[in-house]
Each structure stands twice: as C-alpha cells, then as structure tokens.
Amino acid sequence: MRPTPLFFALLQIALAAKRADQICNDHCSNAYQKQQSCGGTDDVSSQSATLKCLCADESYWSELASCDCSSYDSNVSAQDLRAYYCNVGVTGGSQGQSTSGDANAATNSNDATGTATDAAAATNGNDGASGTADANNANNTDGSGATDASNTNNNGSTDTVNTNTAGSGSSETTAAAGAAAGTAAGTNSASDQANETGSDATNAATGSDASGTAATNTASTASGATSGSGSDAAKKTGTNTDSDSDTATKGSDATAGSMTTAASGLGATNGTSNSTGSHSGSMTSITTGSGFTNGTSSRSGSGSGSSTRSGSNSDSSSSGSGSRSSSSADSSDSDSGSGSSSTESGSGSGSGSSTSSGSGSGSGSSTRSGGFAATIPTVTFGSLVALALNLL
C-alpha cells in the first residue's frame, strides 16, 4: 500500500504541533524556575512579590510571553502583568511599585512601598490630622473630648468617668449645690436621723435622698418638707384618708394606721375585720368562691336595713361537726351537721336565698327555700320500711 500525499500532510502537521508544544513546555519550564528563584510559588498570594522581583529579568518576560504560560492567571498576558507590576509601558504612574509613593495609592493593600505619603492613608492606621480614623488614638489634642473614654475635661458633657468642676456632666444632678451636693447622707445637717417628718414619699424608709439633695433644704423653704421642724405647710399629712397606705409609717402626723378596715375582694375577709359606726341603708354582702370565711367578722351598730346574700354561693363543711352561722342585728339562722358532709350549691338544690329583714327591733322573718328537701323522702321511706317489718 503506497502512502498518499494526504497522509504525509497530516503527519507533518502533527509533528509540527508536537514540536510547538515542546517549545512552549520548555519556555514555561524556564519561566517557572525563575519564579522559584525569587521565592514564588503557585499560590496567588505571592504573585505581587514574585513578579516585582523579576521586573528587571528580560529573559523571564521573554519566556513567559512566548506561549503566555503564566502559572498565576492564564487569562492575563505577560505584557499586562509586566505593565501592572513593573511600570513598563504605562504612563502616568503605576498602581504598584513606587519609591516615593503615589498620590492615588489608596487602592494598595499597604504595600511595602508606595503608601508612605498617601493622602488617603485613613486605611493604614496611621495618625491623621484629626485622628478620627485612628484605632488607638487617645484624642489628646481634642478640645471638647467628645470621644474620650476617660478624660478630665472641664465641661464634661459626655464624660464617662468625669471629675468635672463646673458640674455640667450628666452624672451630677445637683450642679447648683456644688461639691456639697454629693456628700454622704449621714453628713446632712438639715435632715433628721429617721426622717420623722417623712412627707417625702421616697424618704420614708431611708431618711435621706439618694442624691443628697436633702442637705440643701431648710425648715423655711417650700421644699423643706423632708427636713423641716413641723411648721412646714407641706409636712401636714395628717389629712390623708384611710386608704393611703403610704402614710401609715410617716411619723407622728400620720393619722392613718388606726383604722384596720382591710376588707377587700369579693367578700373573702381573712383575719379580723372590725368596723364601728352606724351602718344604715342597704348593705349587701356577696360571697363567691368556696365560701370559707377565716377569722372573725363582727359588725356593731344600729343595723337597720336589709342584708341579702346572693350569687352562686357554695358553703361546704366536711369536718366531723361543722356549723355555719350568720348573725345580724335582726335575724339569725344557723345550720349544723354532725359526722356528715353538708353541701349547699347550685340553684334550687340547697342554695336558695336567705333574706333577713326588719326594723332593728330583733324581730323579722327568716325564709329558706330549697334547703334539704331531698332528705325528707329518704327519711319517710325508711320509716315506712321499718313499719312494714314490724307489722310482719
């Protein structure tokens, strides 16, 4: 079989391509060895230092340009790399190496050279003209000390730990009192030891203001109620009503505390409740819940009017011998149970309504509807059974 011209043509093309590949491999191998001599590796992070080291090596750039075999970025030509890192073929200054520093080198990531005289050196951490971008700047030259952490400025407008003399700092609440305003409460000559006058609601327990303002009060001032002698008009708190619990511990002028009418809630009175006087008109007591009344509840007086118990009352007594009594000035009703559980609940099943009325003379009518009507048929049926047995 004779070889055709086409076969020889294809063979020549293949051999030429192989020789070209070998030439490129040689060029790239030489370029890679030169990179290693400058300490460069395949790591992109070392690209800047390695290429700057090879800026003056013409053979390196020639090898690299023969096949564009950059080991860093195959998409960037050798010419572009040299122009960027070596300032070759670029006018108007470079973005890389420079001995005196570029004016627009703010884009540099703090290269070894080129940022010493940058105008936009705010990202370098160096001290600037105003020190606003300094990481460790104490702002010693600031007149106002607005950003000082622990300054000793005279105005102290925003000091955290100030030693102000003018007293305009935020932590000094009594600037008019001067240095005496911050003295301890024990040295306040105008305040009593126990704050006996005690008309100040916040001083009833401690006897002195926390900020020491009681030291400046006198007996004749309008605000002297916290440290006056007794002639202050603002000190007279004896006219407070019985419901003011705050005045119960405020000195001798407080008339509250003698009344113990602590009845509250919906009729559940715990402890002893005594109320004297004349209770006239309509008096309604509504008991809700379990109906247990702890303690003693007594009322004395004329007792005229009506007493009505309504609602969903449930009086339960489960002890051995329980009793429930309700006494007023004009009526009395009582229930007693022995050894059993007596329960009144619901409507029409033992609850009913208990109404006592009269004119206070002790007479009246007590009506109970419902009651224990369910027990009557039980007793009658038992009696009939017993009678039938006796007859037999």
From Swiss-Prot:
Glycosylation sites: N75, N139, N155, N195, N270, N274, N294
Biased composition (Polar residues): 148-161, 237-250
Keyword Lyase recorded: no
Keyword terms: Cell wall, Glycoprotein, GPI-anchor, Lipoprotein, Membrane, Secreted, Signal, Virulence
Sites of GPI-anchor amidated serine lipidation: S363
Main localization (coarse): secreted
Subcellular location: Secreted, Cell wall; Membrane
Name the record gives this protein: Induced during hyphae development protein 1
Signal peptide bounds: 1-16
Reported induction: Induced during yeast to hyphae transition, during biofilm formation, during oralpharyngeal candidasis, and in response to serum. Regulated BY FLO8, NRG1, RFG1, RGT1, TUP1, TSA1, and UME6.
Family: Belongs to the IHD1 family.
Protein purpose: GPI-anchored cell wall protein that may be involved in cell wall organization, hyphal growth, as well as in virulence.
Residues excised as propeptide: 364-392
Record's compositionally biased regions (Low complexity): 96-147, 162-191, 199-232, 251-371
GO cellular component: extracellular region; side of membrane
Post-translation changes: The GPI-anchor is attached to the protein in the endoplasmic reticulum and serves to target the protein to the cell surface. There, the glucosamine-inositol phospholipid moiety is cleaved off and the GPI-modified mannoprotein is covalently attached via its lipidless GPI glycan remnant to the 1,6-beta-glucan of the outer cell wall layer.
Start and end residues of each stretch annotated as Disordered: 95-375
Membrane topology: Lipid-anchor; GPI-anchor
